[in-house]
């Protein structure tokens, strides 16, 4: 009987410890006292440096608002995808600088950077972002042109006779 009581007491202590643990895990990395999270995102030839901080949902790209920087509304919607998946659409401000590549590559780099920064801010988002495929770097780049051909894969017209 005493062994049973000892075992139940141990189990109860373990359960109370588990219940007292915080629900959200503590953030992995912070870069300064103001609570900014930093990440870099890459896509094609574009590299984006992203700073994420708790705020009202403002997004600034190269010192311009997101609507000024990206002309198409579909680009803006895809950049907001990590916030929609994690249900934090108006909880973070984003400041990012992006260089290289074209508009599509820059959009992909910013998306990747925001996803990585969100993952650093709250590790609970990791599974959601991973399932959405936002933490994986899209490694597709332009194939190089080969000599003796017109393009990367296009060849000159072949004649049998």
UniProtKB/Swiss-Prot annotation:
Gene3D superfamilies associated with the record: 3.30.230.10
SUPFAM superfamilies: Ribosomal protein S5 domain 2-like (SSF54211)
GO BP term (any one): translation
InterPro entries: Ribosomal_Su5_D2-typ_SF, Ribosomal_uS9, Ribosomal_uS9_bac/plastid, Ribosomal_uS9_CS, Ribsml_uS5_D2-typ_fold_subgr
GO CC terms, sorted: cytosolic small ribosomal subunit
Record Pfam families: Ribosomal_S9
Keywords for the protein's UniProt record, in alphabetical order: Ribonucleoprotein, Ribosomal protein
Any one GO molecular function term: RNA binding
Record-linked NCBIfam families: PRK00132.1
Family: Belongs to the universal ribosomal protein uS9 family.
Protein name according to UniProt: Small ribosomal subunit protein uS9
Provenance organism: Rickettsia felis (strain ATCC VR-1525 / URRWXCal2)
Organism taxonomic ancestry: Bacteria, Pseudomonadati, Pseudomonadota, Alphaproteobacteria, Rickettsiales
